[in-house]
Amino acid sequence: MAVVTLSEMMEAGAHFGHQTRRWNPKMSRYIYCARNGVHIIDLVKTAVCMNNAYKWTRSAARSGKRFLFVGTKKQASEVVALEAARCGAAYVNQRWLGGMLTNWTTMKARIDRLKDLERMESSGAIAMRPKKEGAVLRRELERLQKYLGGLKTMRRLPDVVVLVDQRRESNAVLEARKLDIPLVSMLDTNCDPDLCEVPIPCNDDAVRSVQLVLGRLADAINEGRHGSNEQRGGDDYEG
């Protein structure tokens, strides 16, 4: 059975690429045609890539690999958090901070600081501090939760990075490649397929397209880990 059908992808608008003047020629192998100045992605090839991505991701999950979902643009942010949580993956959905991967020791210290502040807040320790000091600590807590909240279960570097928008997340791409971490990437017509190990050519701007692709990848991770794609707890990433 196909992981995703042509009709599902059509309904999600997965076939709409960017304006023809904004394309990357390396994506030509995945482009069906140009219509009204917009490239149309070949969904038959997308379906093949989705099948490959599903199998690859399921196999990686089965062997105990840890995943990081990355998508910081507005239309992807909520989906990234929901689907990552559903399959027990870590995620970044607000802003990629330089060194999230390449300066992991420092980033891990900031995550530990976040956990400490959360414990202080839940125990009432912050409320017991002088008003000004408590306000400073709460602002720090809010900032860390916003940018690092999705990484709290990540005790070490991920084995796989799943990307929504390759061009927007160029810093994440550079860091992952520097550390030889494989990338599973949604690729719009302005992307470079040579910069990822597992390409998924599709519209990376439409919410429904992002939901469809990330939903299937989360299913693959759950199936690889648990033998089914049902939702499980989010503690599988730790260890």
From Swiss-Prot:
Listed GO CC annotations: cytosolic small ribosomal subunit
Biological processes, Gene Ontology terms: translation
GO terms for MF: structural constituent of ribosome
Cited InterPro entries: Ribosomal_uS2 (IPR001865), Ribosomal_uS2_bac/mit/plastid (IPR005706), Ribosomal_uS2_CS (IPR018130), Ribosomal_uS2_flav_dom_sf (IPR023591)
Top-level division of the source organism's lineage: Bacteria
Classification via Pfam families: Ribosomal_S2
Keyword list, A-Z: Ribonucleoprotein, Ribosomal protein
PANTHER family found in the cross-reference section: 30S RIBOSOMAL PROTEIN S2 PROKARYOTIC AND ORGANELLAR, SMALL RIBOSOMAL SUBUNIT PROTEIN US2M
Entry's family note: Belongs to the universal ribosomal protein uS2 family.
Protein name: Small ribosomal subunit protein uS2
Source species of the chain: Synechococcus sp. (strain CC9902)
